[in-house]
Structure formats: C-alpha cells, structure tokens
Amino acid sequence: MNNSKNKNEIKFSILKKINNPIELRKLPKKKLIFLCEELREFLIDSVSSSSGHFASGLGVIELTVALHYIYNTPFDYLVWDVGHQAYPHKIITGRRDQIRSIRKKNGLHPFPFREESEYDILSVGHSSTSISASLGMSISARKEGMGRKVVSVIGDGAITSGMAFEAMNHAGDIKSDLLIVLNDNEMSISENVGALNKYSNNFISKKIFPFLKKNGEKLLNKIPRFKKIIEILENKINNYFSPKYLFEELGFNYSGPYNGHDVLLLSNILKKLRLKKGPNILHVITKKGMGYAPAEKDPIGWHAVPKFNLQIGIPPKKQNSLNTYSSIFGKWLCDTAKKDKKLIAITPAMREGSGLVNFSKMYPNQYFDVAIAEQHAVTFAAGLAIGGYKPIVAIYSTFLQRAYDQIIHDIAIQKLPVLFAIDRAGIVGPDGPTHQGFLDLSYLRCIPNMIIMTPSDENECRLMLHTGYQQLGPSAVRYPRGYGIGVKFSNLYKIPLGKGIVLRKGKKIAILNFGVLLIQANIVAKELDATLVDMRFVKPLDNLLLIRMAKTHKALITIEENVIMGGAGSAVNEFIMYNKLLVPVLNIGIPDNFVSHGSQTEVRSSLGLDSIGIKEKIKNWLNFLV
C-alpha cells in the first residue's frame, strides 16, 4: 500500500498540491501543460475504478484549468451547463480525494451542486440553463459594482435548446458583461453549423464558380474589378454561414474557433476576454473523450460508464439475462411499426437511453430525434397527430416536465392521440435530484383527457403501451429505469380502460399498488394477510373496485413511486371523500422532499419503500396491528 501511495504521489506530483484554484493560480504558466496531463490521467484512473460520467470531462481538462487559472473563482462566477463535464472542476476545487465517491450514496453529487461547494455557483443537471442564470448573475454583479466576472460554459448539445437562444437573445440586447464559452466537441453545434457551411460551399463550388471558371475565365481576367467582386461575394456568403455571423447577429463579440486542448493559448485568450466589456462568445473546439483512445472513438458509448478495465478499453456490459424496460419499449415499438406505417417515434436527444437505436436504423423514415427540444417534441407530435399519424414521444420523466404547457395546450385540450412513453419514472438513482422521475403522476393527473398507466412488470408495460397506442386521445405509460423481473410475455391485447386486478384476497386491510413496487407490496400483503390490488391505472381509477375495497376492508393503503402530494394516492383520497366512504387511507410514496443520489435499492430503502419500510409504515399507522 505504501509503495502504491508513493507511486501516486510521484505520478500526480503537481495535482496533489492543488487543493483549490488559489493554489492553481500560483503555478508558473508553463506548468499548466503538465498539470493537465496529470489531471487527465487522474480522471481516467478514478472513473475506471469507481464509475461515472467520463468522456465529457476528458474533453474539457485544458478549458477547466485555464478558466480557474485566469478567473478569480469563486469570487468570479463559473457556471457549467448540464454538469456531466464538471469532474475536472470538482477535482481542482477541493474534492480530488472524494472524486471516487461521486454518484454514490453520501458521496459527491453527480453534477455541480450549490450545497457541496462554494465553487458550484449553480446547481445543474438539465441542459441549457447556464446562459439564463449567468445573465442574471451578470446583472447582479453590475449592480453590485465590485468587478465580479461571470462565465458560462455550454456545449454537448445544450446549445441546440431554445432556452439557450432565448437567453442569448436577451443578453445580446441588454449588452451585459458576460462570457459564454461554447464547448464545441462535435457532439452538438458542429453538425448544424457544418451543414450550413456545406450548403454555402456547395452553393459556391457547384453552381457559381465552376460555371464562371469554365465559361468566363477569360472574361474575369480581362475585368479584374468583376473578379474582385466575385471574391468579395464568396467571402460574404462564407461569413453569412459561419458561427461568427450567427453570434454577432445576436449581439455578441465572437472569438474563435480555437483549439480547446491548448491550455496556454486558452489562458492567453481568456486573459484578454476577462477585460472585455459586453456579451462575448469564446468558441473552442474540443474532442469528447480526449486522451483515452476508446472514448475518442466512441464518445457516446463512453459518456457514462461503470467500472472498467483501462487496458481492455471496452465499456463493460452488465451481465443480466433480464430485459430493461427501455429495451422492451424499443422492441414493442419495432414490432408495432412493422404493422403500422402511421407510427412515428420522437425523442429529444435520448436515442440510446430510451431504447430507440434499433428502431432508428430499421425505420428511419418513422423516427425523429429533435435534439434537446422537449417543448418542440411535444407540439411536433401534436402536428403529426392532426395530420393523421400516430406519434409516440419517448422521453424521460424528468425531461417531460420541461414541456408541461405543450402537453396541456397542444395535446390535451385538443384531445390528440399522442402516446407518452415515460422512461426513468420513479427512483432513478445515482444522478440525484435533477434526474429522479417522481413528479409525473402528480403533474399529469390534473390534466383533463389524459389517461395514465403504471405497469407493475415488463409484460404489463407492453400491454399498456399497446393499449395507449389504441386510444383516441392522449395517454401516458410510465416505467422505471432498469430491468424487469423476468415475467413471461403474453400476446398483446387491449387492457380494459381503468380496470385493476385483485391479486390476493386478505382481511382487514387492502393494499392498492400503483406501478413497480408490486413485488414489495406482495411481500407485505402476505405478511399482514392483506388484500393486494394492482390498480394499473392512475387515471381513470377503477371506481367500482375502490368502492368494493372500501366497503369490505377496515383500511386502505396506497403505494406508489411518486410524490405523495397529488399522486395516485391523492386520487384515491379524493374519490373516497367525494363518495363519503368511511374508511381511513394511508398513502405511501415519496415525501415532500427532493431525493439525493445513490443506487435505486439504497434510495428506496432510505425512503421506506422496500418491503421492510412499507410494512413498518403500515404497522405504525394501524393501531390494531401493533
């Protein structure tokens, strides 16, 4: 152990002395190159032994070091968009020795988090929030009058969101002092800008100039002034389609593009930009996964990884014979599209996570990835439905909330047949409070015309997707992250709308389960000799079944992996009270708190949503079971 420790001390001789950016700024500039080498090696070593977001952090090593070297953080505000690229930031802001605990229970938060460090000025997790927040901070800094600077780092797809452009439009209008660093790692803006550049190049090379060179070369040589005009025109067209033109039209001073892996160059540029007034854009070109060849070749596959062997260089696949809910959705989607050419699948930049890879390859004409644009995705689906198609929006629960008005205004009011396949519902786990999906039942249940289904296993998920797809109005199927339980698949059939199933008959109490906690509920039902009902539908409820349960039992227990407030249990409460049914009801779910990170099992246990916790909650509530 001592030999290993000594080797690490030699290996990271500069990094081990950097416990905060103040110590970083004491380094001679020439040593920054060596620090970046050590930081990259340390990040590779730590993530390979602990898991976490990987490729994005490797791409911003030099940028992170340069920003903290030039800016007086934490007095100057450094804001990271999304935050999965912030591991290097955490390492050099006092959390180096804790980095292996990231995303684990009681460990470092997976993203910048205000409660964790004074250097994390904005808690993040969702994309495209940084520019709006940074603009607000810059206005505050101007009113404060102490010379505070504000920097926003955005990229990795976040710039494609409408919110980012809304903020830039505002910033360019009010001319506030703000630096936006566009981290162009070829996974975000580069394709869009590249397409425009390709268009302009084709326009010039294939239409105007070949014709002139072939048929008018002599004329051009005889009329130098005309030749000069053509050259000016070519430059203007190229400028029109460049990032510089785009950002300058929004009111920003544009600098770049520059090599984002040259820490000395970045330091020199940032030193000048720190003194520059008004809204500024620094465009840097980086490579996601830089410094680890397998991640450079496959940045998507290496975006977030479990523990892995550095020498093998292959992201390990989880050994599990069971299917994930995402893959089950993807298989159902392919099977349905084979029979119905009207099916259209839509995802806001979550092709891999939502299980759409195979579908996108098999049915490219029925597949749309709209980028990080949840609002657009939903209203786009509305338009398709009006046009006679059958759209399915595949989206994470936590991201669907970004399109709430569109669900109401563009889908529900018009009773359009759009199916929402809501992945990562309930407890998600290691990505923390920004990614837990436990609000959707509450915010969807209050919307008129909405059908909401909560499958308890993977076969139920298939049946509910099939049922939702047949509806003439909006419907939602919410399912969790992770694997099913291994049940056999039945033939697809349409589930009777709003009908639950009694799985076990007991005495005194009835447990009404909504969703994937059915296994835990079944264990408790057997131990307490309780009736167990798989309610299946949150909306509409099985009213007749509820009346029967209320009249034949002394108490009802509702169980759901959603916040208690406004959720499925609240729907039961409302029904019981409205119908004057004299039976007490205990709602078990997620309390009125945001839930931190940890494994799904750990989080459920801490919330009392495992079988032990559920039984304890029930026994504490029911006097006759004490």
Swiss-Prot record:
Belongs to the transketolase family. DXPS subfamily. This is 1-deoxy-D-xylulose-5-phosphate synthase. One of its GO terms (cellular component) is cytosol. GO terms for biological process: 1-deoxy-D-xylulose 5-phosphate biosynthetic process; isopentenyl diphosphate biosynthetic process, methylerythritol 4-phosphate pathway; terpenoid biosynthetic process; thiamine biosynthetic process. Thiamine diphosphate binds at residues 84, 125-127, 157-158, 185, 292, 374. GO terms for molecular function: 1-deoxy-D-xylulose-5-phosphate synthase activity; magnesium ion binding; thiamine pyrophosphate binding. It comes from Wigglesworthia glossinidia brevipalpis. CDD domains: TPP_DXS, TPP_PYR_DXS_TK_like. Its cofactor is Mg(2+); thiamine diphosphate. Homodimer. HAMAP family: DXP_synth. It catalyses: D-glyceraldehyde 3-phosphate + pyruvate + H(+) = 1-deoxy-D-xylulose 5-phosphate + CO2. It comes from the Bacteria. It is an enzyme of class 2 (transferase). SMART domains: Transket_pyr (SM00861). Pfam families: DXP_synthase_N, Transket_pyr, Transketolase_C. Mg(2+) binds at residues 156, 185. The gene is dxs. Keywords: Isoprene biosynthesis, Magnesium, Metal-binding, Thiamine biosynthesis, Thiamine pyrophosphate, Transferase.
